[in-house]
Curated annotation (Swiss-Prot):
Pfam families: NusB (PF01029)
Any one cellular-component term (Gene Ontology): cytosol
Entry-linked InterPro entries: NusB-like_sf, NusB_fam, NusB_RsmB_TIM44
Gene3D superfamilies per the UniProt record, alphabetical: NusB-like
Gene Ontology process terms (BP): DNA-templated transcription termination; transcription antitermination
Protein name, as recorded: Transcription antitermination protein NusB
Single Gene Ontology MF annotation: RNA binding
Organism of this sequence: Bradyrhizobium diazoefficiens (strain JCM 10833 / BCRC 13528 / IAM 13628 / NBRC 14792 / USDA 110)
Keywords for this protein: RNA-binding, Transcription, Transcription antitermination, Transcription regulation
Similarity comment: Belongs to the NusB family.
SUPFAM superfamilies in UniProt: NusB-like
The organism's taxonomic lineage, starting at the top: Bacteria, Pseudomonadati, Pseudomonadota, Alphaproteobacteria, Hyphomicrobiales
HAMAP family: NusB
Described function: Involved in transcription antitermination. Required for transcription of ribosomal RNA (rRNA) genes. Binds specifically to the boxA antiterminator sequence of the ribosomal RNA (rrn) operons.
């Protein structure tokens, strides 16, 4: 039986899983900040002490790379005014970012941040990981939108990896 689990080149399984868990946690944290207006320090304290690597309401959350989680969340918060216009430009006409569900805004912002700033992670891995994160929350059509938007942003910031178009 073939192993269909795709791992990013150069990352150990443990590191890849910890980064994937960090991405999922970052999206959840950004969503909570967007919906509830929670502050970044409160979010860090809550997620690092109660969520990452713990059991919550019967679900066990994977241990996450805390530094990666913090970088994505703080980077999105710091750069949101620059990220949102990039995402708006990549979205279909008539669908500005403010009309997109809050969870998808969090996914797109985190993915756009990583594509722009985390050159240590291959761009295609970033897109694939955030499509997987989106898949945990929304249907296939919306994950297709996540793929298309992040691919377009990837071409802008990492044309050498994606091809310029």
């Amino acid at each position: 039986m073939a192993d269909n689990n795709k791992k990013p080149a150069g990352l150990t399984e443990k590191k890849a899983n910890r980064r994937g868990a960090a991405r999922l946690a970052a999206v959840q944290a950004l969503y909570q900040m967007d919906i509830a207006g929670a502050g970044i320090n409160d979010i860090f304290a809550e997620f690092e002490s109660h969520w990452l690597g713990n059991e919550v309401e019967g679900d066990t959350y994977l241990p996450a790379e805390a530094a990666f989680f913090r970088d994505v969340v703080s980077g999105v918060v710091r750069d949101q005014k620059k990220l949102d216009p990039l995402i708006d430009e990549a979205l279909s006409k008539g669908w500005p970012l403010k009309r997109i569900e809050a969870i998808l805004r969090a996914v797109l912002r985190a993915g756009a941040y990583e594509l722009q700033h985390r050159k240590d992670v291959p761009g295609r891995v970033v897109v694939s990981e955030y499509v997987d994160v989106a898949n945990a929350f929304v249907d296939r059509e919306e994950t297709g939108m996540v793929n298309a938007v992040l691919d377009q942003i990837g071409r802008q910031f990492r044309g050498d990896e994606f091809g310029r178009g």
